[in-house]
Structures are given as C-alpha cells and as structure tokens.
C-alpha cells in the first residue's frame, strides 16, 4: 500500500496544462481521457471506443515504473471557496461523511455551488459518467445532506466531463 497523494485530490484531462511526470506518462498511452488522483488510488478513464485489454499492460508498466520506493506523494492544496454558512456545512458533510465512501469506488464529489435550496455537486473520477451515480446521488448523497443541512431541498449533479 503506497500513499499516492499526501494532501488533497486532483483530476486531470488531456487538455490540462500538465507538469507532473506521472500524469504525462499515463497520458502517453493512447485513448486515456481522464486521470484522478486520491490518497491511495489512481482512477483512469479510457475513451469509450477503446478496450481495457489493449491498455492495461502498458498502464501497469508505467505505474510500476513511476510509483517506486522513492516516489514522493503528491500534494494538491485545497481551500474552501465558500464563505456562507450553508455551503460550509454542505462541504463538511461531503468531506466527513460522503467523500470517504465515494473514494472507495474510485471517485470524488465536490460542492460546486449552493443557491436557493439547491446544492450543485461535481462528480469526479470513476463517478463521472457512472450509470449508478444518479441513483447514488438522489438516494444517498441528497438524503444525507438534507438530513444534516435542512436548508437544502435538492442536490443536483454537474458533470464537467460530459
């Protein structure tokens, strides 16, 4: 068990300005669309028209080459962009009760905005585009946020990857 990220988490697409060697190496493999880094995992999304059988061997070789004994865990600084009480409370619920469970499935969820009773969240990593994410969002995430932050009437997904 190797710690990949010491602090924070981060998602990369091919269009991002990338200066991390491990990210450049993974994107050197054709048909990789997205890479998401969290504490002890990396989630990689391939193009829809590609096959994991064609990518796995090359990706594993890259990861074994990059994540060696002297690998220094990545640090992604994260600061809250919200100053209102309700948004801060929503972030607290996400960070303490929801994100750890979502991370176990290779994804992440972040508050994008809160206005007039509607919390808009970003789905990242394996959660972005996952067929069951809508059900999880409405029956799990929304229910929990509404329980702890009664001002919230609805939680909606905002997916930047679609």
Please place each PLM-identified region on the residue numbering.
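Domain-level signature for proteins that mediate thiol-based redox and metal-cofactor handling
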Residues: 1-162
